[in-house]
Curated annotation (Swiss-Prot):
Protein name: Uncharacterized Bro-N domain-containing protein L2
Entry-linked InterPro entries: BRO_N_domain
Domain Bro-N, residue spans: 92-214
SMART domains assigned to the protein according to its UniProt record, in alphabetical order: Bro-N
A Pfam family per the record: Bro-N
Length: 246
């Protein structure tokens, strides 16, 4: 993300130091798009500025943090786009920014607040089914995903608050979404060799990270699959974790 951000900032002709610090004023004016950069910058907290010639400069990490927490939709969109580039094989799950991505494949998803301080994720079922090698995504979801683990988009909107700017314009109200348990249902019945790899990813890394702070991120790396796991073990473990958190 840092490398991608610096590339964009250079394209915007931002004032930067040799050590990579960015002018706070330039960042707020050219990237955030504030009409009053001075006032906006004065309200930003915990950015640890470096003062050079009476001007504030901040690190790329601070810039990313500002983008992530900005109220403007275009800032959140830029933050999300920084995480996915052509050829990128990053795996990311971010509750606050509706990101569910495995090795560069980002699924249309919505992390929803269940009004009790807990959250749930609903993922575009057809995208998951096709990714896992099912020839007929509708049939796969109907047969393998339990009814309690799937909803059409209209039901999600009626039951959970969703920001309108996070909804793709082409999304039909009858589109089927599945939750994490449904995701595991499809993984379990997939015949693709990498399905076990995804099971291990969810089991070993994603669930523990999400329970801790609601965000999971990893850089591409080879995952060595342990085939001594029984087929049902990981899916059952995930279902127990999810059930215990509800």
């Amino acid at each position: 993300m840092r490398k991608n951000l610096l590339r964009i900032l250079k394209e915007k002709d931002m004032s930067m130091t040799k050590k990579g610090y960015i002018s706070l004023y330039d960042f707020v004016e050219k990237i955030i798009g504030s009409k009053n950069p001075v006032a906006y910058a004065s309200k930003i907290k915990d950015h640890n500025p470096v003062i050079i010639n009476e001007k504030e400069y901040i690190s790329p990490e601070s810039c990313l943090n500002i983008l992530k927490n900005a109220k403007f939709a275009k800032c959140r969109e830029l933050y999300n786009n920084l995480q996915v580039k052509d050829g990128d094989k990053t795996s990311i799950i971010d509750v606050n920014n509706n990101i569910f991505q495995f090795e560069g494949k980002r699924f249309t998803s919505f992390f929803v607040d269940k009004r009790d301080g807990k959250w749930d994720v609903w993922i575009y079922g057809a995208e998951v089914a096709r990714f896992l090698g099912y020839n007929d995504d509708k049939k796969a979801i109907s047969i393998h995903v339990e009814s309690c683990n799937r909803l059409i988009f209209e039901e999600i909107r009626n039951n959970f608050p969703i920001e309108s700017n996070s909804i793709p314009k082409t999304l039909d109200k009858k589109t089927k979404f599945i939750n994490l348990s449904g995701f595991c249902n499809l993984i379990h019945h997939s015949k693709k060799p990498f399905a076990m790899k995804i099971k291990k990813w969810l089991d070993d890394e994603v669930i523990p990270a999400l329970i801790m702070d609601g965000v999971y991120s990893m850089q591409p790396k080879e995952l060595k699959v342990k085939f001594f796991y029984e087929d049902n073990y990981i899916s059952d473990f995930l279902l127990r974790v999810i059930k215990n958190r509800e």
